[in-house]
Amino acid sequence: MSHFKSAEEAAAAGKYVRTVRSFVKREGRLTKGQAAAIERLWPTVGLTLENGRLDLAMVFGREAPVTLEIGFGMGHSLVEMAANAPERDFIGIEVHEPGVGACLMAAEEAGVENFRVFHEDAVEVLKQCIPDNSLNCVQIFFPDPWHKKRHHKRRIVQPEFVKLLIQKIETGGVIHLATDWENYAEHMLEVLNDEPRLTNLSSSGDYVPRPENRPKTKFERRGEGKGHGVWDLQFKTNKSATLLG
């Protein structure tokens, strides 16, 4: 067991400590269409850790607000939101390769060009590729709830991860989370409320109604038909707030 309190502390001492991952990377099996879309479109829209720290204006060929979606699944929300907001640019991160392929197929069919994608670990992308204060919005919709208590440490929404997000988001930018697991929603709310540099945009101090710009998924509609709830959270960054501790 390591005596270092964090990966950063270990790195400073020249040591490597394996960090807890919030995902299991599953390559899965690509359909022919997904494989063809990746081969055809990746040179244009694909990004990797090897790109290093990005100049987002150069990546997109313009200055525009940038939304980052972490864990875009099959890409439905990413593509629809990019299509509906051509004045914005979008970056998606997904570890499941068939999801990347499906996203590229959908984007090509919709004629969407204001997006880029990573097939990487979100934490590494944030640390290595995303400049500080460069994002206008970070959205994470229906992340893995890791519902067993012993797996809660694998949930992506944790205090250290939120600190990393704030570092990458401009002042006044937004973190938007959504989940259909009430226990995870409560966990998210607690983590975000405990961060002094975030302000809850909910008038009731907890959750917000689903924003019109967040598309409903088929899974979400099915769940609603069965009486399942969905919880959206939106918090705004306020970096002038004093950090406690």
From Swiss-Prot:
Enzyme class: transferase
PANTHER family according to UniProt: 3-DEOXY-D-MANNO-OCTULOSONIC-ACID TRANSFERASE/TRNA GUANINE-N 7 - -METHYLTRANSFERASE (PTHR23417), PENTACOTRIPEPTIDE-REPEAT REGION OF PRORP DOMAIN-CONTAINING PROTEIN (PTHR23417:SF14)
Keyword tRNA processing in record: yes
Keywords of the record: Methyltransferase, S-adenosyl-L-methionine, Transferase, tRNA processing
This protein's record includes keyword S-adenosyl-L-methionine: yes
Known role: Catalyzes the formation of N(7)-methylguanine at position 46 (m7G46) in tRNA.
Catalytic residues in the record: D144
Highest taxon of the lineage: Bacteria
Residues that, per the record, bind substrate: K148, D180, T217, K218, F219, E220
A Pfam family matched in the record: Methyltransf_4
NCBIfam families: tRNA (guanosine(46)-N7)-methyltransferase TrmB (TIGR00091)
EC number(s) on file: 2.1.1.33
Family to which this protein belongs: Belongs to the class I-like SAM-binding methyltransferase superfamily. TrmB family.
Record-linked InterPro entries: SAM-dependent_MTases_sf, tRNA_(Gua-N-7)_MeTrfase_Trmb, tRNA_methyltr_TrmB_bact
Source organism (scientific name): Idiomarina loihiensis (strain ATCC BAA-735 / DSM 15497 / L2-TR)
Protein name stated in the entry: tRNA (guanine-N(7)-)-methyltransferase
GO CC terms in record: tRNA methyltransferase complex
